[in-house]
UniProtKB/Swiss-Prot annotation:
Belongs to the PTH family. PANTHER family: PEPTIDYL-TRNA HYDROLASE. The keyword Cytoplasm applies. GO terms for cellular component: cytoplasm. This is Peptidyl-tRNA hydrolase. CDD domains: PTH. The lineage of its organism: Bacteria, Pseudomonadati, Pseudomonadota, Gammaproteobacteria, Enterobacterales. SUPFAM superfamilies: Peptidyl-tRNA hydrolase-like. Keywords: Cytoplasm, Hydrolase, RNA-binding, tRNA-binding. It comes from Wigglesworthia glossinidia brevipalpis. It catalyses: an N-acyl-L-alpha-aminoacyl-tRNA + H2O = an N-acyl-L-amino acid + a tRNA + H(+). It comes from the Bacteria. It is an enzyme of class 3 (hydrolase). Gene3D superfamilies: Peptidyl-tRNA hydrolase.
Length: 191
């Protein structure tokens, strides 16, 4: 599968990097590290990026450096500038509805309650279709405030599990690009 753009949804990195809601940016940083690349800041358009060759294709790795609810504007501008179709994107984000340690690909994504995903639809239009990689962070226990939960760091135990999950996701992204989505899903979705 050809992915020209892989985006890790994020709030401003300097303020929120280690939080649950910035799992997408964790993923991009881990992926850049795998390819021994350092992200470059585009100050004019508020995002970090780097180009990496995965298999036979170059993919642009991006972390928006703005608030989650406006990530879509940055992504839209990038796709317009580089002539990337929405179905050539993989959007990586946290997911409250998946337990910590679980991740899922979703192809031809069409809706979500995630603010970053809503922002993409707002910028691209409701008919936009793209691919996602959802990384589970679980829900807070005892009905704690969701926003507080998202904007706090995971426990040390959760962090270890999240990092293991991201490592597995990166291997599966390689399979997705180099082989096919069915093979990647079989590996990622296997318990």
């Amino acid at each position: 599968m050809k992915l020209k753009l892989i985006v890790g949804l994020s709030n401003p990195i300097n303020l929120y990097y280690n939080t649950r809601h910035n799992i997408g940016s964790w993923y991009i940083k881990f992926l850049a590290k795998k390819y021994k690349k350092n992200l470059i800041k585009n100050k004019k358009y508020c995002f970090y990026y780097i180009d990496v060759k995965i298999g036979d294709y170059y993919s642009k790795l991006v972390i928006p450096d703005t608030y989650m609810n406006v990530n879509g504007t940055i992504i839209y501008n990038i796709t317009n500038f580089y002539k990337i179709y929405s179905n050539e994107m993989l959007i990586v984000h946290d997911d409250l509805d998946l337990d910590t340690g679980i991740a899922r690909f979703k192809f031809n994504h069409k809706n979500s309650t995630h603010n970053g995903i809503k922002s993409i639809y707002k910028s691209f239009g409701a008919k936009c279709i793209f691919n996602t990689l959802r990384i589970g962070i679980g829900r807070p226990k005892l009905n704690k405030n969701i926003n507080s939960y998202l904007l706090n760091n995971p426990s040390p135990k959760e962090e270890i599990l999240i990092k293991k999950t991201i490592t597995k996701c990166i291997k599966c992204t390689d399979v997705l690009i180099k082989k096919n989505k069915d093979h990647a899903m079989n590996i990622l979705h296997k318990k």
